[in-house]
Amino acid sequence: MHSFNLQKFQFIDDLNIKSISKDITNLSIIYRNYSKKIKSKELIKLKQFCKKKRIKFYISNKIEECLKYDLDGLYIPSFNKQNLTKKLNLNRQTIIGSAHNHIEIRKKIEQGCKIIFLSPLFKTYKLKYLDIPRFNLTKMSFKNKFVALGGIGEKNIHKVKMLNIYGISGITMYKKKPASFKAGFNKF
């Protein structure tokens, strides 16, 4: 069996240090907000905090800001089909992206993604979910690192151990949760 020392990815929509999880072990932050204009002072402050705490800091879909502020990498959502690899310094920055099926996974590989978020793992209010068997079958065809995303909650966090994955992620899983959920999640 493999170890359960998984990389944890937290999506944030606010450039506020208080929104970051208290447990920073193996944590990476993805800033994802398409409605607000980025305030450079806040972005620099968060970048410095992440560097000090050894947290990787990615920005979603904003290649100019990724280059300008020399962030750890770029997150490409599943709806972005552009090829951005020519613009980034791939020696210093990592491209990560999300996908829902084989076609989107191939597109993310073409875009140069080193880590692919495959979603949704469990039932969510939006999409048809993969669940454990289909998730494993989908990722078997590819050699990339995969992160489980979507629908992970208190009732199904233990099922993640059945996956051979690089990391785990969530959008709402880091927001005010019961102590039992945080304890179960922190075991990873």
Feature-to-residue mapping (PLM):
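Conserved, mostly hydrophobic/aromatic
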Residues: 29, 66, 108, 116, ...
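Structural motif
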Residues: 23-24, 69, 111, 162-164
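Glycine-rich phosphate-binding active-site loops on the catalytic face of alpha/beta enzymes
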Residues: 74-86, 115-131, 152-188
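Internal catalytic-core helix/loop-beta-alpha segment
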Residues: 94-126, 130
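Short, acidic/polar
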Residues: 10-23, 61-64, 100-107, 153-158
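N-terminal targeting/leader regions
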Residues: 1-24, 33, 44
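Alpha-helix-loop-beta-strand connector modules within alpha/beta enzyme cores
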Residues: 42-58, 81, 86-102, 129-153, ...
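Hydrophobic faces of well-ordered beta-strands that scaffold small-molecule active sites
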Residues: 4-12, 27-31, 57-59, 74-76, ...
